[in-house]
Amino acid sequence: MPIFVWFLGKVVVMAKKRVLFISQEIVPYLPESEMANIGRFLPQGIQDKGKEIRTFMPRYGCINERRNQLHEVIRLSGMNLIINDTDHPLIIKVASIQAARMQVYFIDNEDYFQRKHTISDEEGNFFPDNDERSIFFARGVFETVRKLRWAPDLIYCQGWFTALVPLYLKKEYHDDPVFSKTKV
């Protein structure tokens, strides 16, 4: 919905600012933590201030699809991303946080995200392919937003799993019309 502003004696139509919120954890999909709570309530606060928002996180194997009502978005899924010379199918799922009237998009891939833990095993050892998982997640978000044809004004990154997003924006996607005016 456009915003109407009175400027110099005229009514000016201003588009809503678009914020792409990328997080490695969001409540209620993962257990409560400081990061997961921020991932849940910050996008809602941004949306409540009149901004248009899209929220993304990885679809970890510990997320219960039935309880959280995740479903695949066929029109966005189906492409392959090449990571380390190997094709990996990109699957996009979506769920809603009803209380916030907010959708969350999930980046999924069987090789990278079907484990029962998020970034480390039960002994606390980081997965050796977390670098590839982070690359897949960052590229998956960019490719999905391109398919949505939704040009964000701002990208907000939360968690080290999103750390490659600013680099990808600067080096790979800066000439893409969807991202040419996007700030991080």
Where are these regions (language model features)?
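Hydrophobic anchor at the start of a short beta-strand
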Residues: 51-53, 104, 152, 184
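Conserved nucleotide-sugar donor-interacting segment of glycosyltransferase catalytic cores
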Residues: 131-184
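A structural signal for isolated positions on well-ordered beta-strands in alpha/beta enzyme cores
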Residues: 20, 54, 154-156
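A short, Lys/Arg-enriched amphipathic alpha-helix followed by its capping loop at the start of a domain
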Residues: 41-51
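Nucleotide-activated donor-dependent transferases that construct or modify glycoconjugates
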Residues: 15-32, 57-59
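Short, Lys/Arg-enriched N-terminal segments with co-localized hydrophobic residues
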Residues: 2-13
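A conserved catalytic-core segment of Leloir-type glycosyltransferases
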Residues: 55, 59-147
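A short, glycine/small-residue-rich beta-strand->loop->alpha-helix junction that serves as a flexible
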Residues: 25-38, 64-66
